[in-house]
């Protein structure tokens, strides 16, 4: 089994800067075979400008570029049913392409999917409630529940 790691973009003021390093060290220590799926940052500032948890533009840009790379790997047959895709955050721009692709792919190319739910609409104290985003976020969460082979952590 190989883990395809979908990490978060690095921000100076958040734990995300260290998160990929911590994860890679843990995988190496345990002898886990893994691939870091790369994304492209919108700029080099590593700052949160719009939003309060992650930068709204930066998260969207990084997540979509990362998903484009994941889709290329899936199309090339690099990811199989024996593998896992681990998303560091349940909210990942481009996530709707997963059920779209997986439900039309042969079983042999349907990996296990792991999504880390850090808060989202299920948490009444999450920022999505403050910014009026709870309705669409809860619908997004329902979509995530329908992804084949999904496990929400």
Where does each model-flagged region fall?
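N-terminal subdomain of nucleotide-sugar transferases
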Residues: 1-44, 81, 109
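Short, solvent-exposed loop/turn segments at secondary-structure junctions
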Residues: 9-12, 41-43, 90-93, 119-122
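Short aromatic-enriched loop/helix-cap "lid" or pocket-rim segments at secondary-structure transitions
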Residues: 15-18, 45-50, 97-100, 125-129
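N-terminal beta-loop-helix "entrance" segment that forms/cooperates
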Residues: 43-63
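An amphipathic, basic-hydrophobic alpha-helix
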Residues: 56-100, 138
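Short, flexible loop segments at the rims of nucleotide/cofactor-binding pockets, characterized by
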Residues: 59-65, 126-133
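Active-site proximal beta-strand in glycosyltransferases
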Residues: 84-89, 103-126, 152
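Membrane-proximal helix-turn-helix segments that form the acceptor-binding/catalytic region
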Residues: 131-152
């Amino acid at each position: 089994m190989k883990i395809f790691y979908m990490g978060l973009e690095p921000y100076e003021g958040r734990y995300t800067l260290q998160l990929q390093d911590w994860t890679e060290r843990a995988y190496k220590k345990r002898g886990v075979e893994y691939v870091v799926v790369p994304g492209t940052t919108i700029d080099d500032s590593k700052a949160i400008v719009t939003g309060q948890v992650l930068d709204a533009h930066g998260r969207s840009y990084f997540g979509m570029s990362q998903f484009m790379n994941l889709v290329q790997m899936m199309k090339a047959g690099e990811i199989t049913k024996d593998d896992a895709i681990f998303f560091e955050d349940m909210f990942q721009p481009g996530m709707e392409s997963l059920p779209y692709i997986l439900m039309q792919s042969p079983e042999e190319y349907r990996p296990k999917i792991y999504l880390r739910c850090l808060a989202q609409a299920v948490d009444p104290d999450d920022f999505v409630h403050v910014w009026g985003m709870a309705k669409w976020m809860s619908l997004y969460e329902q979509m995530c529940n329908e992804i084949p082979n999904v496990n929400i952590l």
